[in-house]
A protein has these predicted regions:
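A short, conserved acidic/glycine-rich loop-to-beta-strand motif
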Residues: 124-134
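Phosphate-binding and adjacent anionic-ligand microenvironments
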Residues: 241, 246-324
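Conserved N-terminal catalytic core of the sugar/cofactor nucleotidyltransferase
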Residues: 2-5, 13, 27-105, 109-116
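A structural signal for short hydrophobic beta-strand segments in well-ordered beta-sheet cores
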Residues: 25, 144-146, 197, 209, ...
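Residue-level signal for inorganic ion chemistry
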Residues: 34, 60, 92, 107, ...
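Short N-terminal binding/cap micro-motifs at the start of the first secondary-structure element
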Residues: 11-14, 139
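Catalytic-core segments of class I nucleotidyltransferases/pyrophosphorylases
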Residues: 100-102, 109, 115-122, 135-138, ...
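Histidine-centered beta-alpha loop that forms part of the nucleotide-sugar donor binding/catalytic region
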Residues: 8, 54, 133-134
Length: 324
């Protein structure tokens, strides 16, 4: 099966953490987000992958190569300037041809059952199927309103609290039929949520929304990045793929075998402490974060070359635990 991975982002809001790295190369507990996504695709059977690049494409090309070390066949499309999510995918028409295909963003951590999503799409004969996920802070995302059959009736882009009527947000993960891409013009910026989906609804093309189990987190802000890193340490990014090949081990060729990932033992306390620190989007995290609450201490910081995230949690009467 085929997948298009959108990996052109620069990650300006994460600049204090990533330096000049492309956004998909952000290290998540020692492993780039991009590596985790390629492993997720392989485990779900999406082994034919086209990656759209824009910002510093040579970094990702050198890192990923032809995809063989991940167990996938990898091709690239380089944009001289951003073309929007749908515009970038439209430029890959020679890749997807007449097949339904997956679209996934390179700036989120995810453990969805993507194979199950693909099967739901085919059963519904939808133009597009959207992976939905509940979010307690939905104001920065697009909300999706559905009928009882799961068909999308309306989109609410980044609402205020007065207009929040659901917690299901658009994750930017889609199964797309080629007929939907016929609505996307060539050679001009075009976005799925802002441009294509309203056209499809106006044309009475069915858009299916599927609430997903598992884990999903957009790492677009420093606050979300650190929260996601703690979730990974706590084991929340485990695969949720009942329809996929469960016997396939993780394939992360660039993971450091000398690093250990261990659960934080009192995660509820740590997360409450982090929340109370009120990390604001765009804050400077160059030197990481150090919090104290009674006898508890929590330190989160990039290592010297920003290739990993180091987390140290010290309990009042316990030996220090270090997770790399």
């Amino acid at each position: 099966m085929k997948a298009i991975l959108l990996a052109g982002g620069q990650g300006r809001r994460l600049r204090s953490i990533t330096g000049s790295l492309p956004k998909p190369m952000v290290p998540l507990v020692g492993v780039p987000v991009l590596d985790r996504l390629l492993d997720l695709l392989r485990r779900n059977g999406f082994t034919d992958v086209c990656m759209t690049l824009c910002y510093r494409p040579e970094v990702i090309q050198e890192h990923c190569g032809d995809g063989s070390s991940y167990g996938v066949h990898l091709k690239y499309r380089i944009e001289s300037e951003p073309r929007g999510t749908a515009g970038g995918v439209r430029a890959c028409s020679d890749f997807y041809g007449r097949e339904d295909f997956l679209v996934i963003s390179g700036d989120a951590a995810c453990s969805f059952d993507l194979l199950g999503l693909y099967r739901r799409h085919q059963q519904a004969d939808a133009a597009v199927t959207i992976a939905l996920y509940p979010n307690a802070e939905p104001l920065q995302y697009g909300l999706v309103l559905q009928d009882r059959q799961g068909l999308v009736q309306h989109f609410i882009e980044k609402p205020d609290w007065e207009h929040v009527v659901t917690d299901l947000v658009n994750t930017g993960i889609y199964i797309v039929s080629p007929r939907a891409m016929a609505y996307v013009p060539e050679d001009q910026p075009f976005d799925f949520a802002k441009d294509l989906f309203p056209l499809l609804l106006a044309a009475h093309e069915p858009i299916l929304g599927v609430p997903m189990d598992g884990y999903w987190c957009d790492i677009g802000t420093p606050r979300a990045y650190y929260r996601c890193s703690l979730d990974v340490l706590d084991g929340r990014l485990s695969p949720a793929q009942p329809d996929a090949s469960d016997d396939l081990p993780p394939q992360l060729p660039h993971a450091d075998p000398n690093r250990r990932t261990v659960p934080c033992r009192d995660r509820a306390h740590l997360m409450r402490t982090v929340s109370e620190a009120m990390m604001e989007a765009g804050a400077d995290f160059t030197d990481g974060l150090h919090l104290r609450d009674g006898g508890w201490e929590l330190s989160i910081r990039p290592d010297a070359n920003a290739s990993a995230l180091q987390v140290e949690a010290n309990a009042p009467d316990a030996a220090a635990e270090t997770a790399h």
